[in-house]
């Protein structure tokens, strides 16, 4: 089957923003105006196409990233709408990893908000080119220039308006296109019809000034155009667009557009900008792959061998396990086999589907540069590389934040007990920031995630999708443990009980590995431990790390280097080395200065000025570190870092001392060593809990 659209006509892009900036409404208008849907779905009445989960429709928020494909101006646009709530940043992270561009949506009243900063940093980490859409220009308090200024002040990047609003709030009627130097007046109807007119006289001077500012900023991306500009020659519209595109593709220029998606003003010009300025798969640098000891470039070509990255796993009620894949090179056909090079496992591609939110269109093949979902991959999880059988390389995987909050779940009946384990495993497959494990001391099943809303949604899904009824305990802080000192530690397991025995012997260097997770290094030389047992040593360490030496919390940020040991020709086996490794880690827990780590949250509190002092004092009383304050429209905004353990009940307290006029948002920042008083209390509480279990 021939390619329907050439690679240069592809746009893989996402919509990203702070919660309530209007991402999903913008996505719904894109679907409607591109002809993908014939009725506009609204988030506020639960009719959104992209927010298809029951929980999304009820709460009016996006929880899972939804993918769809639309066409606009002879281009195929693969669009992913991502969540804005901090608890679901994993969805943003894995979407940005595979996208070539993004539209950052801002609320025209609020400008850049805290979650905007978070998703912007995520996009910068993957060097994703972006354009900015200042939405809700019809909202009371909307201010385009202030929103543009907030991009400079809070994101620290070069943003250049390529449109200006005509009016604001209830008087927002259209936009000025600074490239074409024309005005578009919208009729407000759902088809977003607009009249193109000359720029009104009262806006002409401002438009000329903004046009010249735009030229000053963009000509630097093309030497020939810059020479023309400096010589006083006129720059053509095609040259202007070319310069903007070069700046965007290089991730150093961020054009700003405006409109109101809900009132159908500005979405069609936004779609034009996606086509004109965001890159195609061949405009961005080729993906990097890793073979043993070398880095290789993966050409974006149908003629190259197939290589793809699994960026999401979802459970579909009709077809079962769906694996979302970005294809970087080659062609994949349904019924073929691939190798999961991350896990070294062969997988069969039963079916390939293109997704439209939760709907599926089956296709026979998928080609380089495209995004699809695959049915039939049993062992492939988020971050895994799949490739044709002769490709022994892996793509860079993804790293995800550790869970910060946990709670116990208990099945209500024996039938629920049997279903719960399988259901939790499926949810954990879908969501890399969700963990489930059994507390060895109490026997309770613990689920852990990124926030109370995150766990609330997962418990709701357990009940609705998987029909598992559970009792839920109170939320608890997910502490972590680590080692602060370096030591060489021996683990030796010998068991002789008639017949064949057990023998495993390892010597491991344990040391701190700050912010780098668990790292295992095989330094065995001379065959002191046979190669087939090395993986068992690593597996034994990983299992033992689930139960730290201080209070039984999972261990993180440790490097383990296996450098010595021995084996027995008859008695050595995988289990013996797993046990020996766990014994070594247990001993390291005594000798390497174990420490308890607590999750630290970044909070931003907004209060009227008269409550500023009380709020500052309250944050300090919670062991908070104030990082900065600023005034915004008669309110004070306080940024601080506070331990999560001190934030339970904060919403109620804040409402109380601000008479309901204060609000805050909170997101995970990092893990930090807990003070001695906290360590003692955590150990004491854990001991009491284990006693009563």
Curated annotation (Swiss-Prot):
What's a GO cellular component annotated to this UniProt protein? cytoplasm
Q: Where in the cell is it found?
A: Cytoplasm
Gene (name only): fusA
Instruction: Name its species.
Output: Mycoplasmoides gallisepticum (strain R(low / passage 15 / clone 2)) (Mycoplasma gallisepticum)
Example GO biological process: ribosome disassembly
Q: Which residues form the tr-type G domain?
A: 8-282
Output the NCBIfam families linked to this UniProt entry: EF-G (TIGR00484), PRK12740.1-3 (NF009379), PRK12740.1-5 (NF009381), PRK13351.1-1 (NF009891), small_GTP (TIGR00231)
Q: Which domain of life is it from?
A: Bacteria
Matching Pfam families, A to Z?
EFG_C, EFG_III, EFG_IV, GTP_EFTU, GTP_EFTU_D2
Q: Which UniProt keywords apply?
A: Cytoplasm, Elongation factor, GTP-binding, Nucleotide-binding, Protein biosynthesis
Binding residue positions for GTP: 17-24, 81-85, 135-138
InterPro entries per the UniProt record, alphabetical: EFG_II, EFG_III, EFG_III/V, EFG_IV, EFG_V, EFG_V-like, EFTu-like_2, G_TR_CS
* A GO term for molecular function: GTP binding
Record's family? Answer: Belongs to the TRAFAC class translation factor GTPase superfamily. Classic translation factor GTPase family. EF-G/EF-2 subfamily.
Its annotated function is as follows: Catalyzes the GTP-dependent ribosomal translocation step during translation elongation. During this step, the ribosome changes from the pre-translocational (PRE) to the post-translocational (POST) state as the newly formed A-site-bound peptidyl-tRNA and P-site-bound deacylated tRNA move to the P and E sites, respectively. Catalyzes the coordinated movement of the two tRNA molecules, the mRNA and conformational changes in the ribosome.
The protein, known as:
Elongation factor G
């Amino acid at each position: 089957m021939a390619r329907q659209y050439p690679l240069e006509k592809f746009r893989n892009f996402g919509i990203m923003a702070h919660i309530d900036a209007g991402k999903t409404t913008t996505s719904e208008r894109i679907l409607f105006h591109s002809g993908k849907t014939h009725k506009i779905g609204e988030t506020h009445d639960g009719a959104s196409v992209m927010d298809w989960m029951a929980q999304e429709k009820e709460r009016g928020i996006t929880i899972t990233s939804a993918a769809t494909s639309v066409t606009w101006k002879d281009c195929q646009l693969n669009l992913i709408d991502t969540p804005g709530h901090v608890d679901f940043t994993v969805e943003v992270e894995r979407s940005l990893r595979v996208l070539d561009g993004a539209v950052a949506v801002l609320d025209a009243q609020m400008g850049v908000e805290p979650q905007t900063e978070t998703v912007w940093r995520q996009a910068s980490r993957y060097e994703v080119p972006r354009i900015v859409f200042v939405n809700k220009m019809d909202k009371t308090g909307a201010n385009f220039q202030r929103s543009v200024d907030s991009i400079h002040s809070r994101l620290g990047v070069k943003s250049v308006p390529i449109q200006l609003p005509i009016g604001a709030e209830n008087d927002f009627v259209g936009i000025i296109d600074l490239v074409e130097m024309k005005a578009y007046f919208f009729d407000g109807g759902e088809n977003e019809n607009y009249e193109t007119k000359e720029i009104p006289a009262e806006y002409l001077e401002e438009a000329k000034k903004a046009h010249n500012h735009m030229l000053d900023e963009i000509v630097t991306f093309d030497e020939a155009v810059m020479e023309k500009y400096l010589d006083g020659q006129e720059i053509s519209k095609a040259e202007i667009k070319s310069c903007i595109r070069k700046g965007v593709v290089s991730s150093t220029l961020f054009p700003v557009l405006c409109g109101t998606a809900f009132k159908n003003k500005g979405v069609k010009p936004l779609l034009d900008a996606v086509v004109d300025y965001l890159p195609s798969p061949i405009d961005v640098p080729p993906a990097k792959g890793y073979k043993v000891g070398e880095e290789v470039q993966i050409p974006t070509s149908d003629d190259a061998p197939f290589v793809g990255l699994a960026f999401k796993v979802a459970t579909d009620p009709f077809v079962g396990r769906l694996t979302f894949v970005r294809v970087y090179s080659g062609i994949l056909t349904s019924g073929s086999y691939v190798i999961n090079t991350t896990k070294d496992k062969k997988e069969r591609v039963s079916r390939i589907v293109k997704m439209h939110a939760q709907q599926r269109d089956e296709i026979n093949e998928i080609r380089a540069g495209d995004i699809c979902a695959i049915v039939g991959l049993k062992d492939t999880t988020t971050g895994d590389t799949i490739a044709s059988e002769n490709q022994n390389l892996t793509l860079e995987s993804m790293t995800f934040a550790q869970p910060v909050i946990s709670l116990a779940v208990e099945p209500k009946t024996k039938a629920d007990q049997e279903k719960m384990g399988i259901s939790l495993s499926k949810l954990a497959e879908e969501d890399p920031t969700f963990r489930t494990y059994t507390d060895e001391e109490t026997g309770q099943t613990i689920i852990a995630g990124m926030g109370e809303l995150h766990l609330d949604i997962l418990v709701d899904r357990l009940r609705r999708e998987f029909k598992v009824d559970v009792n839920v305990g109170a939320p608890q802080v997910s502490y972590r443990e680590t080692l602060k000192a370096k030591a060489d530690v021996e683990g030796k397991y010998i068991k002789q009980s008639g017949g064949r025995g057990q023998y495993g012997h390892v010597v491991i260097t344990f040391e701190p590995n700050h912010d780098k997770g668990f790292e295992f290094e095989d330094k065995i030389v001379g065959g002191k431990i046979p190669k087939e047992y090395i993986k068992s040593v690593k597996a034994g360490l990983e299992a033992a790390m689930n139960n730290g030496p201080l209070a039984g919390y999972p261990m993180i940020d440790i490097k383990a280097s296996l450098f010595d040991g021995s084996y027995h020709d008859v008695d050595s086996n995988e289990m013996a080395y797993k046990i020996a490794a766990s014994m070594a880690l247990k001993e390291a827990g005594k000798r390497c200065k174990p420490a308890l780590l607590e999750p630290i949250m970044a909070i931003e509190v907004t209060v009227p000025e008269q409550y500023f002092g009380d709020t500052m004092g309250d944050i300090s009383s919670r062991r908070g570190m104030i990082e900065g304050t600023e005034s915004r429209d008669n309110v004070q905004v306080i940024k601080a870092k506070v331990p999560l353990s001190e934030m339970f009940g904060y919403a109620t307290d804040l409402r109380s001392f601000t008479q309901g006029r204060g609000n805050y948002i909170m997101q995970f920042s990092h893990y930090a060593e807990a003070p001695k008083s906290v360590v003692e209390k955590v150990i004491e509480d854990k001991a009491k809990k284990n006693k009563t279990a």
